[in-house]
Every structure is written in C-alpha cells, then in structure tokens.
C-alpha cells in the first residue's frame, strides 16, 4: 500500500521535558519522525515544550509550537493549524495521555482529526490494565496473577487473594511512577495511596510477585498487511523486581535456546495482533520462571519507547523513522533499509554479529535522603551503551563508559574488613545502583556462582562470564609487565580490559601500559554496525572497536573534525550538550568537513547514524578517544560541546598531540582554576565575591572569619554543584568539613561569600578571538543561591535596568578577549544593590545554549563551531546581539515525586532533570505557560500561605497585596503576618509547625491551602519547614521556596487563563524584520 493521499498535514506530539523514565530517546524518535514525514511531502506540525530538543529546531517541522503538551493548548493549535491527522506514538507516555485527552474531550472529532500510528482503542487496550489482562487470556497467554483496584477497599480485597510480596502498578503512568513492591501491610497502604493519587484514571494493578524471574523484551514492528519483524531481543541481566529502565540489559538475548526464542517471538507477534498495533513499533516484556519455565506477558507499550531507542542503536535499524512511514500507509516491504544503501528492504529482520550492553546511570548522590534501592519504579537518569564482539568485551566497555570512576570491575569493598561479608550479602540481596561491582567483589571473596545466583537471581551464564574476568584479573596481578606478550595482551583486550584497569592491576601508569601495548603492535580494529551481519555491503560508517584482524574503518583523506559527545545523561549534564554536538556536526558538514562523532549514549540524536558522516560508538575515555584519533587523524577535535566529560580529557589529548580547536585547554584551565581566575578578575578590575581556597579545617575556619558568613562551600572542579552548600555559621561549617567532603592538599575546598538577596544573571556569548557577540542576557527568577540549572530564567531580563545590562555586556566582552575564547562562553554574574559580581566563567557550551538559540532564532552552537574551524564572526554575518520582542521563560523540572523523603527545596546543588519553555508578549504570560509546561498547576484562588525569612520581609507585603487583589485569602505565620498587617492588609494567622496545632501542615493535609510561599535560611529553619514542602508535593499544592518566584507567580496570575499559541517560525520572522 503506497502512502496515503487523503491526508496532507500531520501533528506530532512531543514528549515534553526530560524526566526520569522519559529522556532524550523521544527527541531522537520525534526528530526521525519529522524528517521521515517531510521527505514524503507532508506538512508537519510539531508541539513540544522542551527547548533543548533537536525536534523543536525551526527547520525540523513546517510549524513548531514550543507550548505545554496539555490537551487545552494542543486544542488551540489544532484549531489554528487544522491538521488532518495526529501521530501520538513518538512522544512517550506524555503524548499518548494527551492524545487520549483530546479524544475524550471531543477535540479530534470536532476538527475532524484522525489518530494515526495507534488509535485510541489500541492505546487504551494496551494501557488499561484490566483490558490488557483480558486480551492476553483471549489469545492463550498468561499474565501475572493480579487484581484491579480503584480504592483502598478494593486493593485490600486483591491483597487477600495474592498475599505478600506483591507488586503495585498505577495505570497510565510511565517509568513505574507511583508503583513499588510491598512486603508488609504498612508499605502496601503507603504505595497504594500514592499510586491512586498519581494514576490519571485512579486505577491500580496489583500483581503477584515475580521477583527473581528472568525478564526479556522483544522490539517488534508491524504494518497494515500484518508483516511483522522482530528488530531485536533484549535480555535483562537483573531479574524481575528491578524496573527494566534500571536494569543492565544485553542484546541479543544470551541465555535463550532457539526453541524458547521462537515461542517468545510468536507470543510477541500475537500480542501486537490482539492489541491492534497496525503501524509501527512496540515493545513486549516477558517474565520467565527460571525453575518451571512458565512464561508470562508483563506489559506492552503501543509506541516507540526507551527500549526501541536502544534497539535502534543496537542494530542500526531506525525504528522511529520506519514507524512514522508505516503510520502513513506504507508496508515494510516497500521501505528501504538506509544502512545497506537500499540493498535490503525494511522487512528483513536485522541480524547482528556482536553483543550490546546497556548500563543505567543513577544520581543518588544528588538526593542523599532518597531510597537508593532499585524496585519497580524507575530511578536512573541516563544510560550508556557499548558494543563488543563478546559479552565480556561489551560489559567492560560499558563499565568504563559510565563515568562513575570505574575503569572495569573495580573493587568496592575492603575484603579484609570484618564487615565485608555482611556488606556483600546485603548488596547482593537488595539491588542498588552498584550491584554489579559488589558481585565482582563477592567472587573475589571466594563466593561461588551458585551462592551468588541464590542471592541475586542473576542468570548463571552471566555470572560465569564475570567469574572468568575476575580470574583473569587475579592472574594479571601476579605478572610483571614484561611477561605480557602480544598473544596475552590480545587475549586481555578481547575480554574488554581497559589500559587503565590493566595498569592498576600491574601497579604501573596508564601511559606505560599504552606504550607497551603499542610496542607489541596491539591496536583495536573498527567494525561496522550494518543490520545484516556483513551479508551485504554498507556505506554507513557506524563503527565500534574490537580486537580482531580485519579493520572496516576505511578512513578517508578529507579534512575532518571530530566532536566528542557528553556520554550518559546525568543531572547537570544532559540533552542540552547533545543538542550542541548535533549542531556542530550539522554546521561543519555543511561547510564541507567530514564530521566524526564519538559518543556512547544510545538515547540521543548525536548517536544517530546520519547526524554525522562517521559515528564511533565508543566510551569517552582517553584510551578509546586516542585510538579513534590514531585511525582517523582528524584536523581538529572539539571538546567544548559535551559538558565536563570531554573537557576532562582536553589536557591529556593535547599532550598526546591531538589538535584541539577552539578555546585552548590552557584558557579553560584559567577559567576553572580559582587562583588563576582571581588574578584575571583583578587584572580587569572587576568584582568577585570575597573567597578563599582552603586545604585544612584550621585554614577554613580562619578564612571564614575574614570573608564573613553566610558562605557558599564546595569542592573544586564540579559540574552541577555537587556537594555544594550554603553555611550560615561556624558550627555548620565544621559539620560540612566533617561530613560532606574530605578536605586535603589534593582536594581543596572553596569558600565564597554568599551574596544574599542578589539577582543572578546568565550570559551566553560567542567570540572569535577579536570580536565578541552577546547571544543573550538572561535574568534568573530565583535569587542567587539556587543553582543556575534549577532556576527559572527570563529572556530578555524582566526587571534589570538598561545601565546594568550595558555594564554586563562590557564585562563579558573584556573577559572573553582576555581569556582568548574561540567559540562559546557562558558567564554567571550577580547584581547586589548596584554592584555587579562575576560568579563564574565557563569557556564552553552551556546548558542555556539551546534555549537562547530558540529565543533569538539563530543557532549559537553552529556559529561557534564555524568560528572554531577558523571563520570570523564578520564572515558569518553575526555581529549584533539579537534582542527578542517577546518574553521567553525557561523553567526547570524536578524528580522529587520519584524520591519520597527528599526535601523539594532549591539550593546550590543542581537537582533538575529537564526544562521547558514558555513564550508570551509579557513576562507574566511567558511565566504562566512555562509553569503549565512543567505540569505545575497555578491556583486561581483560595488560600495562600506565606511564611518568609527576615531578608524577604521588605517584599512580602507587595506579594500579599497582589494576591488579595487576585481574590486569595492570605494566611501567614506570626512574624510574616505582622509585616503584612503593618501595610494595612487583611491576614489570618496560623501556627508554625514548631508552635503547636492546628498548624500549617494540618491545613495542607485538609486541602485548605492552594498556594504556598515559604522561604527559609539556615539548617534549622530548613529542617523545621521540611514537612510543609513535602506535604505540599504530595497534595499537589503549588509551593515555591523563594520570594522572587512568589512575585513572578503574581505576574502570571494577573495574566489570567486565556492562552494564545505561537508558531516559533512566526516569532523568528518577527526578529529578522
């Protein structure tokens, strides 16, 4: 069936901000869908609230709306654009839920819009737990024994049937949100209450426990003519009980016999037919009991998912692109496989001659109070994938690509300590983020594979593979370097051992080991990912390293530029940096360079095989990058676009003779090294907050006395404000030095005077060495002290005078030229009174670059990449700062709901996972839309509770006056109420939590409050008010912890609920006029 001609325009729903469970894989799928549909001649309309995505680039769709993915906003877009069809399968759970809302509210029917890719009934059948259960029984497949509950009474009735432990999963949520495993009644009630609260349909599925069962996934694609292919089978290394997004996974499945594989293959096809997925990709999850072989279907997703991004990258088969084309009527046999250059049709099942391992990346260090045990609710924030010829090789490559300080199966436990045995037992029994390293330690301690299997449920096959690696390590430890000959070195490298790990085992430096290996002439070769196990030729350069005979890299002799990506997502380094890498690749390819991407994150657009000319799917370690450089001999390497990951390699790459283009590693060091930075600030006669670098506790106490409290304290060289705190007095400083960091000569601690009540600013600029152009000045809404990645910001600034902005421009230009920046640079400044302080300078791509580029209609990352390759800003015609004639607000999105027990207060340590953008004619409108995009519901009336610290009291009466004018009743604690009453306003007093009942938390629990403005300072007051913030989060009450955000909310509420939607392309056209 060729493509449909009865539809002309298609609306694609994006996935919105990055949250745990829904990350950049949906930017990857959405961007592919946009490209696929436009090349077929359709008009594409896109809605996505996340500005850091490639899919929201104005060139990706015909009409782009950076608007909230809520049915109300999308309805306005449908009314304006009149699309013929909507494609909801590319934007994760967010898009599916939005599509179902549009259907339910009659919007699709009213405007005659058809749902393609999956219809409402299919989505409902797959997502509604009771319908899915019945559908599986109809085709003779088993689901886990389970029951459905819509209330606590029903839940208790199901529990009677199933007993403990049981697994609770809310309907229509993703990443297992709100679910969990209950081992006793108390846990059961807590999880069920939370689950009923979070499920949009107030429905829970309560399952028998399958903990310890083996878990598999099948990635399936089906078309209208019932052609089905399995793209890839995926096996979970961790058994059931750990969410698949948090499991180590391996593709293809390693421990199935062919017969078992065929049974599962047939079952997954039957599931797609029964649910009615006719066009596109789905994944089906299975559990198998290791003792009896009983197989159950756990769930299916009728959409492109996290696993399909992994399967696409693992096989080279572009699932999202194919799914988009099937949705418009094509069949698999009509579509060509790009990787083989059209030599095979898309109906060929991919076959692969290598092993892929995915490891999750966690961020528990950011949330010390979070429960770090892994259960059925997803907690990881990113992932890394590695390709090798054997499981051992791909596992060890993935371990070093994860960037958690391990270069392989490094030891975690001191086996000589008396606690060792009990630590190992606990870590093996209850899975945590680092279980695989504990498994290795258990093997070192003499535990047998059987004993480990009994504690972990990890398949014996995997354990035997790991045991072999540990035995090999023990052998290497006994040898001298000279004893390792060419054959033995090859054997070790084929098992995936890194130079660094071998050097540690031999007690020598990495450099010496690498020299020895090169002397033996042991080098990796590069193999191609070609979807067909080398049966057909491929022109696509999608490569991975391994130690074999034949190298398939065939590098060209063109001028090449290599871009180092950011590795796995984590808090503080996410999709924004990937966006910059993609833009660099696109710009330099346009300019005639051959572009080479090195990265290991399977979720991203940068690791798509057609983003750059050549893709090396390799860990970002010195060894791996140097080997790629050895083969490719690039003319220049860009290290400034992938966040801290490639920057950490800059110096060592330079020493090894790799040509780094753009800002020099020495200039980067001048900006990062405190003492060198201070000299520069003084030389330019600029201001910075009084500060000191200390190397012992005594020194710290002395320095603190002369700088004056409050202080910002942190270890040097960190990204995302790791272990950063504000301390208000001596005892707090001592506690920080004791508990949070080990201060020493090698790891100094930085003290800065904290600028209380200051307005923070962020500036992005491009410099070519002689000219500097400001990309944008952004004003933070939260005052200084909140990490810049967590603060909302406004572009242009909404309350800074022209004089202040001009002075900022002068200072930024001075610093760019003094540092010799070539490329991008980001500066953070603070305004206190009438003084401007420089807080920090980063001569690299920052996380605000995508947001700024969307606001000013010009890609800073592209311009800067061209500058790094030798162009001047004058040649590029970018000489003038572009100041938008509309307001844009960027708002951060947080994962607090996933981590009960964590305080949702903002501070100097970054905690957000993603961002959204709101656009409006006024600051208030833009802020209101950003809140809506972040799924924060702004109250329109009711009772506002206000309690602020002394420093905020001068502003509090103004906020109260606004709220009363907007129809709110104001309640406040004694100190705050006094100030409001003094201004002649009506206020009701309420007890603080520490002053006896009824207090404010009682009001929250009784749903008597609709808005909370609660600001604190100092450890004690933060601890006292913790229950206010946590309860507000549980009761979904809008709560802000800064007075500045309180003022912004008043602006947003004045704007009122009537929304207009704006095309990005129209906004940009207005800037050029």
UniProtKB/Swiss-Prot annotation:
Gene3D superfamilies per the UniProt record, alphabetical: 3.40.50.20, ATP-grasp fold, B domain (3.30.470.20), Carbamoyl-phosphate synthetase, large subunit oligomerisation domain (1.10.1030.10), Methylglyoxal synthase-like domain (3.40.50.1380)
Residue positions binding Mg(2+) 1: 285, 299
Record keywords, A-Z: Amino-acid biosynthesis, Arginine biosynthesis, ATP-binding, Ligase, Magnesium, Manganese, Metal-binding, Nucleotide-binding, Pyrimidine biosynthesis, Repeat
Residues reported to bind Mg(2+) 3: 828, 840
Start and end residues of each MGS-like domain: 936-1073
Cofactor: Mg(2+); Mn(2+)
GO biological process: 'de novo' UMP biosynthetic process; glutamine metabolic process; L-arginine biosynthetic process
One GO location term (cellular component): cytoplasm
NCBIfam families the record matches: CPSaseII_lrg, PRK05294.1, PRK12815.1
Subunit note: Composed of two chains; the small (or glutamine) chain promotes the hydrolysis of glutamine to ammonia, which is used by the large (or ammonia) chain to synthesize carbamoyl phosphate. Tetramer of heterodimers (alpha,beta)4.
Protein name: Carbamoyl phosphate synthase large chain
Organism: Pseudomonas putida (strain ATCC 47054 / DSM 6125 / CFBP 8728 / NCIMB 11950 / KT2440)
Lineage per the UniProt record: Bacteria, Pseudomonadati, Pseudomonadota, Gammaproteobacteria, Pseudomonadales
């Amino acid at each position: 069936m060729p493509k449909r001609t009865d539809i002309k325009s298609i609306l694609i729903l994006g996935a919105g901000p990055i949250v745990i469970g829904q990350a950049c894989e949906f930017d990857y799928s959405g961007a592919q869908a946009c490209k696929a549909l436009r090349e077929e001649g359709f008009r594409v309309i896109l809605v996505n609230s996340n500005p850091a995505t490639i899919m929201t680039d104005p060139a990706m769709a015909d009409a782009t709306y950076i608007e909230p993915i809520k049915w109300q906003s999308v309805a306005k877009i449908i009314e304006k654009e009149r699309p013929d069809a909507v494609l909801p399968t590319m934007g994760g759970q967010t898009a599916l839920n939005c599509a179902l809302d549009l259907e339910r509210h009659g919007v699709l029917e009213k405007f005659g819009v058809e749902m393609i890719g999956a219809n409402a009934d299919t989505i409902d059948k797959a997502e509604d737990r009771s319908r899915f259960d019945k559908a599986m029984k109809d085709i003779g497949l088993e689901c886990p024994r389970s029951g459905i509950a819509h209330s606590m009474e029903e839940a208790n009735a199901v529990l009677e049937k199933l007993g403990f432990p049981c697994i609770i999963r809310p309907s229509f949520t993703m990443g297992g949100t709100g679910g969990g495993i209950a081992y006793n009644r108390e846990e059961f009630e807590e999880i069920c209450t939370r689950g009923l609260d979070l499920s949009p349909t107030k429905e829970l599925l309560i399952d028998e426990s399958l903990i310890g069962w083996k878990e598999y996934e099948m990635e399936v694609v089906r078309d209208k003519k019932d052609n089905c292919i399995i793209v890839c089978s995926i096996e979970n290394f961790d058994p059931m009980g750990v969410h698949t997004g948090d499991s180590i996974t391996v593709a293809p499945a390693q421990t199935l016999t062919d017969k078992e594989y065929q049974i599962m293959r047939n079952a997954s096809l039957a599931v797609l037919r029964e649910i009615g997925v006719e066009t596109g990709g789905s994944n089906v999850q299975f559990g198998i009991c290791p003792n009896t072989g009983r197989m159950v279907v756990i769930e299916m997703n009728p959409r492109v998912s996290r696993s399909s991004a992994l399967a696409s990258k693992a096989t080279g088969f572009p699932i999202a692109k194919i799914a988009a084309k099937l949705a418009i009527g094509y069949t698999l046999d009509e579509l060509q496989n790009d990787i083989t250059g059209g030599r095979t049709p898309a109906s060929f099942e991919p076959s692969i001659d290598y092993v892929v391992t995915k490891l999750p990346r966690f961020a528990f260090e950011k949330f010390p109070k979070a429960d770090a045990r892994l259960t059925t609710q997803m907690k990881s924030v990113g992932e890394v994938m590695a390709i090798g010829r054997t499981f051992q090789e791909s596992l060890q490559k993935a371990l070093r690509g994860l960037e958690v300080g391990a270069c392989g199966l490094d030891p975690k436990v001191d086996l000589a300590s008396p606690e060792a045995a009990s630590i190992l037992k606990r870590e093996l029994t209850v899975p945590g983020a680092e279980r695989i390293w504990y498994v290795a330690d258990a093997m070192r301690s003499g535990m047998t594979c059987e004993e480990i299997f009994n504690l972990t449920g990890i398949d014996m096959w995997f354990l035997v593979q790991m045991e072999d690696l540990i035995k090999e390590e023990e052998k290497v430890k006994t040898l001298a370097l000279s004893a390792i000959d060419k054959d033995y070195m090859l054997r070790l490298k084929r098992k995936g051992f890194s130079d660094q790990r071998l050097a540690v085992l031999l007690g020598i430096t990495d450099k010496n080991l690498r020299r020895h290996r090169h002397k033996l002439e042991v080098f990796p070769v590069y193999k191609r990912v070609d979807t067909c196990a080398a049966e057909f030729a491929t022109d696509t350069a999608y490569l991975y390293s391994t130690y074999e005979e034949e190298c398939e890299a065939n590098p060209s002799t063109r001028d090449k530029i290599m871009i180092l990506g950011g590795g796995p997502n984590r808090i503080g380094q996410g999709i924004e940096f990937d966006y910059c890498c993609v833009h660099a690749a696109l710009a330099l390819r346009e300019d005639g360079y051959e572009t080479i991407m090195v990265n290991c994150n399977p979720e991203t657009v940068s690791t798509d095989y057609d983003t750059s000319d050549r893709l090396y799917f390799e860990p970002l370690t010195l060894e791996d990058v140097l080997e790629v450089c050895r083969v490719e001999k690039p003319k220049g390497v860009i290290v400034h676009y992938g966040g801290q990951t490639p920057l950490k390699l800059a110096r060592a790459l330079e020493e090894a003779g790799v040509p780094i283009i753009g800002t020099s590693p020495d200039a980067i060091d001048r900006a990062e090294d405190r003492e060198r930075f201070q000299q520069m600030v003084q030389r330019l006669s600029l201001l910075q907050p009084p500060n000191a670098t200390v190397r012992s506790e005594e020194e710290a106490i002395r320095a603190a006395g002369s700088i004056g409290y409050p202080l910002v304290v942190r270890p040097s060289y960190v990204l995302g404000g790791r272990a950063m705190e504000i301390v208000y007095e001596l005892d707090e400083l001592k506690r920080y030095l004791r508990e949070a960091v080990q201060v020493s000569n090698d790891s100094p601690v930085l003290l800065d005077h904290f600028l209380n009540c200051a307005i923070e600013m962020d500036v992005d600029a491009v410099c070519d060495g002689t000219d500097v152009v400001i990309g944008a000045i952004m004003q933070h809404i939260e005052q200084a002290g909140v990490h810049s990645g967590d603060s909302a910001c406004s572009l242009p600034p909404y309350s800074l005078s022209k004089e202040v902005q001009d002075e900022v421009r002068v200072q930024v230009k001075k610093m760019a030229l003094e540092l010799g920046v070539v490329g991008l640079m980001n500066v953070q400044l603070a305004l206190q009174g009438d003084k401007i302080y420089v807080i920090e300078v980063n001569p690299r791509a920052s996380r605000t670059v995508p947001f700024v580029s969307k606001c000013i209609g010009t890609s800073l990352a592209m311009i800067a990449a061209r500058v790094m390759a030798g162009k001047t800003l004058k040649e590029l015609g970018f000489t003038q700062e572009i100041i938008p004639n509309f307001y844009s607000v960027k708002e951060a999105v947080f994962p607090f709901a996933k981590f009960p027990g964590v305080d949702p207060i903002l501070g100097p340590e970054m905690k957000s996972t993603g961002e959204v953008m709101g656009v409006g004619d006024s600051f208030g409108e833009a802020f209101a839309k950003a809140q809506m995009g972040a799924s924060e519901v702004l109250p329109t009336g009711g009772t506002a509770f206000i309690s602020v610290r002394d420093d905020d009291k001068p502003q509090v009466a103004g906020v109260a006056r606004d709220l009363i004018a907007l129809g709110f009743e104001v309640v406040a604690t004694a100190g705050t109420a006094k100030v409001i009453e003094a201004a002649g306003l009506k206020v009701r007093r309420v007890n603080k939590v520490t002053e006896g009942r009824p207090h404010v938390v009682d009001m929250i629990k009784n749903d008597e409050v609709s808005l909370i403005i609660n600001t604190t300072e100092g450890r004690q007051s933060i601890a006292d008010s913790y229950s206010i913030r946590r309860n507000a989060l549980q009761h979904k009450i809008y709560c802000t912890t800064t007075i500045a955000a309180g003022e912004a909310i008043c602006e947003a509420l004045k704007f009122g609920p009537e929304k207009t939607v704006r095309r990005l392309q129209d906004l940009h056209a207005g800037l050029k006029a």
